Amino acid sequence: MKDRVRSLVAEGIERCFADGSLASNQMPAIVIEKPAHAEHGDFACTVAMSMAKAERKAPRVIAETIVKHIENGESGIIGGIDIAGPGFINFRIKNEAWSRTLAVVEAAGASFGRSCAGEERKVQVEFVSANPTGPLHIGHGRGAAIGDTICRLLSASGFDVTREFYYNDAGAQIANLALSVQSRCLGIEPGDPRWPADGYQGDYIKDVARSYLNRETVDAGDQHVTAAGDPNDLDAIRRFAVAYLRREQDQDLLAFDVHFDVYSLESSLYTEGRVEEVVRRLIENGHTFEQDGALWLRTTDFGDDKDRVMRKSDGSYTYFVPDVAYHLAKWERGFTRVINEQGADHHSTITRVRAGLQALNAGIPQEWPEYVLHQMVTVMRGGEEVKISKRAGSYVTLRDLIDEVGRDATRFFFLMRKPDSQLVFDIDLAKQQSLENPVYYVQYAHARISSIFEAACDRGISVPSFPDAHVDLLETPEEIELIKLIGSFPEVIEGSALSFEPHRITYYLQELAGAFHSFYNKNRVIGEGKELSSARLFLLKGVAQVLKNGLALLGVSAPEKM
């Protein structure tokens, strides 16, 4: 509807140019917004203010000129146009025009809300990317929900999306993992003086050790690893432990309905020589220096607050060097747009990774890649914070939440706040089967509509299709509000996708569910006469479709019974 209003304004301005009423002959950007107050109409346009300088006229005079040239016609969508204040053009849409939105929803079905805004442009989204050193924690879970939903939103907006998981399967943390598993294999427990200083203490380490000693075989992605069973073969333990925990993380993500197109391994950057090649190019480009036996990168040349060590005096690389190599590989794979969804604790790495990429002189834009950073999650039960999982040892796992409150509630709750806002996950609320639980509130609206359809069927009343639905009878404030909300769904999707803000979908669905509950509490659907019942059933058919489509974008089910 907003696009149709924009087109009417543009056509009116073209007529002004054609007859000389406006002199600039340059079409301005036409912004159509929802007014802050309902009494000002359905849409407002500020184009007259933006044209004032070029036209050398008062905005209100320009607005009056444009309005005179807008041709709506008897069958048009505009029910009224007002000019307010210094030159706001306010539009009121005819009820019958709003009602026709329902026919669009019916025709599009599961595709309603999707657009071609992305024009099939390639976008790579990297998310989760957990170290394979233990079960996924709740921070990974929030990142998985946000990243996965961003992918769904971008796909719905016409982008060609590649989902990628980067395994940090090299470095000090993996060495600590291997030592921890080896210690368990040898019967050494935490607290023993022989236990590794930075060892992992969760019960899952015992599980890995037991499987290793039993010479089990693990399949993880393209890896097929059979345990050697030798507690003294640290390299064999490392390979098995990484594969074992990769498999566990993959199973957790599958339970969370999160899937990836590409899995990349940090270790492959070393075996393929990519890390050494990046270091060679950085040295060759003159952006490095040696000091105290270490190799440094002059990241201050590219906006960092201090220079950074690349290669330590012992010959090992700091973690951001393989990150630079990995992102160069992304660029070389043709991804001119990359979005990294990460925890806020990775904020400090952004500047140095971008600095390394700039120092390569590879033609990579300064602000590439883009980042979405999520804040921490606090889990509450009975008014107290939950901090420990027996299996993980020191943190609450994603699997803990899924097992306790279910996938739907876990995903919805993770998505209810803007990524850069801290999130309190109330387990008690997530388990409630009441309208106080946000995900239950939305799902119940869908289930309630299904029960209405079932009741209609029991009375021999079928849910109609357009044009037999008598939508012209839909005129109560609650009915029109529902239709307006339904009509705004495509815009909500596109806005959420382009801003990387999935929480907008949760807000929208709660608003739509609330509008439905308000409508249902004030209006009878069945028993108000055949034609009005038909119209209201058709309205609810549209509401149910949009609720289902919106929940699908969040990876949440739309049950028909609850």
From Swiss-Prot:
Keywords attached to this entry: Aminoacyl-tRNA synthetase, ATP-binding, Cytoplasm, Ligase, Nucleotide-binding, Protein biosynthesis
Motif segment ('HIGH' region): 130-140
Subcellular location: Cytoplasm
Superkingdom: Bacteria
GO BP terms in the entry: arginyl-tRNA aminoacylation
Record-linked CDD domains: Anticodon_Ia_Arg, ArgRS_core
One family name in Pfam for this protein: tRNA-synt_1d
Catalysed reactions listed for this entry: tRNA(Arg) + L-arginine + ATP = L-arginyl-tRNA(Arg) + AMP + diphosphate
Coiled coil, from the record: none
Quaternary context: Monomer.
HAMAP family: Arg_tRNA_synth
The protein's name in its UniProt record: Arginine--tRNA ligase
Protein encoded by which gene: argS
